């Protein structure tokens, strides 16, 4: 025997699916005669909504999605872990979308997620980290937000009004600079990232501001913005060490870069932190696994994911969470920083 669906009920009653939903969920007035007709058909067929029908009735699927640019970068799985644990505790299942840094793939996922009728989206990296996001990409995200709530993590779309959860990366970068200054460093460099990304430039600007308070600055030749991977950090650190007057300390855009910088420094026969200090950013699990253990800035990555889900859950349930949730960074001192060598 063929199962009766909500569509069959609507067809037999000659009404829309949404009208059947309103009757079942009692969410809005329905003419008494229409309600009686629908209820009579439901009783006749002994209709019991399945999961799909319940989602139509409630307009919820119990599924949320997270879009991120690089699952191999240790920062993003840590955020995902916090988000997934919180989501499962709230009864959601999770849809992971890894874009591999491809903006077109971001658009494809947005289209798929709308078709899947997920209840909401957490968005990391990609277009929301661009210093200037192209109008079409910004508009696409804003249009999507009219159909389902979206929470941005460590990023922004200017004038979009979208909810944000982020760590104050500028404050974290200033902490890194202050830590090195307290150890007597005056020759400081910055390695990693990309100039078109706000997550890079907010750190560079914060470091420069802190140094200028002490009458110092990072010259252009010591700002090597060459990517986010371990290999990128290794390559850019090698360039620094080839300079006539290498720095005594290096601030890296993330822990991956810092690990690459450590590898290069050791290959050059230098000692860390005796000859040069290196500080990372993020406090991923790799930071305490490398030798020497990495001094770094914690972004509270697990909490970023958890808080993002909490905000999204409140939006899904018609709540009014604050527009911005800001987490404070923390300096984690380990073995890779020490007094200046000169």
Specify the residue positions occupied by each region the protein language model found.
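Flexible loop/turn connectors
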Residues: 236-342
